[in-house]
């Protein structure tokens, strides 16, 4: 995978792009390239990460303005080609606003910003996410969000369950998410959105390495 490159998207207001790049390059030796949101040329990257932060200041709704950027418009063909896309926190919000993933991320039930480490059950490894030859069924990752409560209607929830599209569930739901959902994939399995931050759990010196389960999955084909 010497030539494999992960594009890390940068929006006005992104603040986790460097964290993602550090985790991929420093912990996994995976090459990264920053992609400014106005770019529509994705030809030289093999996978894409939409990082956390506050794209466009989260005006209107989280991810509501970012969905109109040229890069997100170009993402449609990228996804259709089968290449992998990971949306973390604000990136997950952008993926739902853009229609790449169903449902929505809304204000936490307690209306407060939550910053904590949470335990998560790996519910599905659809598309190869979290499936790196390890039998671990529970991981611990940090969360940091004010609008991270996953919400969908009953028909969508049934579809998520029936098609094994729920990747992660909270053990102790911190934000009121429907069905304790912390992360989901698309039907093809090459797009994953999750509210927890795997890039903040890639080295023991910063609290753990469970985030590697997610980031390693980017290099699968």
UniProtKB/Swiss-Prot annotation:
Record's protein name: Phosphoribosylformylglycinamidine synthase subunit PurQ
Catalytic reaction equation(s): N(2)-formyl-N(1)-(5-phospho-beta-D-ribosyl)glycinamide + L-glutamine + ATP + H2O = 2-formamido-N(1)-(5-O-phospho-beta-D-ribosyl)acetamidine + L-glutamate + ADP + phosphate + H(+); L-glutamine + H2O = L-glutamate + NH4(+)
Enzyme active site: 89, 197, 199
GO BP terms, alphabetized: 'de novo' IMP biosynthetic process
Pathway assigned to this chain's UniProt record: Purine metabolism; IMP biosynthesis via de novo pathway; 5-amino-1-(5-phospho-D-ribosyl)imidazole from N(2)-formyl-N(1)-(5-phospho-D-ribosyl)glycinamide: step 1/2
Subunit description: Part of the FGAM synthase complex composed of 1 PurL, 1 PurQ and 2 PurS subunits.
Enzyme Commission number: 6.3.5.3, 3.5.1.2
């Amino acid at each position: 995978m010497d030539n494999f490159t992960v594009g890390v998207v940068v929006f006005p207001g992104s603040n986790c792009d460097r964290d993602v790049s550090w985790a991929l390059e420093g912990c996994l030796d995976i090459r990264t390239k920053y992609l400014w949101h106005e770019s529509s040329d994705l030809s030289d990257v093999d996978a894409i990460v939409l990082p956390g932060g506050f794209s466009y200041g989260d005006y209107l709704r989280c991810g509501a303005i970012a969905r109109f950027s040229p890069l997100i418009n170009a993402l449609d063909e990228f996804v259709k080609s089968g290449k992998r896309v990971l949306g973390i926190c604000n990136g997950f919000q952008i993926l739902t606003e853009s229609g790449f993933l169903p449902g929505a991320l809304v204000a936490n039930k307690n209306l407060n910003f939550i910053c904590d480490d949470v335990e998560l059950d790996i519910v599905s490894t659809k598309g190869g996410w979290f499936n790196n030859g390890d039998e671990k069924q529970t991981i611990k990752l940090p969360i940091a969000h004010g609008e991270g409560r996953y919400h969908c209607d009953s028909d969508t929830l049934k579809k998520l369950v029936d098609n094994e599209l729920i990747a992660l569930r909270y053990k102790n739901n911190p934000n009121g998410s429907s069905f304790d959902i912390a992360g989901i994939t698309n039907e093809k399995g090459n797009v994953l959105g999750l509210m927890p931050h795997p890039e903040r759990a890639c080295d023991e010196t910063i609290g753990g390495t469970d985030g590697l389960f997610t980031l390693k999955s980017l290099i699968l084909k």
